[in-house]
Amino acid sequence: MKWSCYNMAVLEVLIYMTKAIFLSYTGVVIPRRGNEYRQFIDTLVKNSNLRDYEHAAKWFTETLRTYKCNSSSDDYVSEENLIRQMFEDKRDEIRLSMPIEKVLVMVQNCLIYSPISDELAGFLALSRRPVYIISDCACDYATIEMKRNHLHIHGTFSCDSVQAYRNYPQIFEYALQKAGVKKEEALYIGEDAQLDLPGARQAGITSVILDRRGDYQGTEFRRIRSLSSLLANLGE
């Protein structure tokens, strides 16, 4: 399936220029699904005034995005501590009745044990370009998940390394340096038109959003519906 907003000239540039592919850990490598994620959201519903699963999942995603976007390198804290801070701030608002430490354990379980994308193994096997992961959370989570699923990745880069989340360019610039590629030689597959895609763009990296459900039809960013369609457009 072709990217509708691409012309052939842009496709030719991608095919011949791309030397490295970067994937968002959350959303792309591990979609928000699976027993661990469902258990976390269900528990959140039972222990708060968030009325149902969809409402709670949306609240968590959007609130965490806001906290990350409002964070700067001057007041950066790790994702775990940011989530702790978020639930401490919002405890009364959502009438949270469970210990925040239990929330953190459940989030950690999501990051380590959630099922990976059904496409990922095939994507890694077929890609002729090296593939890297960029993550808001510590590298250990992605490393454990990859080992658990017997998958090889060329490297994982955490926002902790640069003390800035993915809405800033620093993590992408760091990833380029470590991967040994120029910005015009990299392609980033992201998850959020308000968080990581703007950061990648600031770093000068060609970026697309993996829009599996068609949620971003009005976005200014290029979209793909699957990782397999990306390989097709890269001539692989």
Locate predicted features.
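Short intrinsically disordered, low-complexity coil segments enriched in acidic
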Residues: 1-3, 55-56
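Asp-based, Mg2+/Mn2+-dependent phosphohydrolase catalytic module
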Residues: 2-23, 96-98, 130-236
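N-terminal helical cap/lid subdomain that shapes the substrate entry/recognition surface
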Residues: 16-118
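Alpha-helical elements of Rossmann-like donor-binding domains used by nucleotide-donor carbohydrate transfer enzymes
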Residues: 39-43, 82-89, 122, 170, ...
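Short, acidic loop-to-helix structural element flanking the phosphoryl-transfer center
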Residues: 105-132, 169
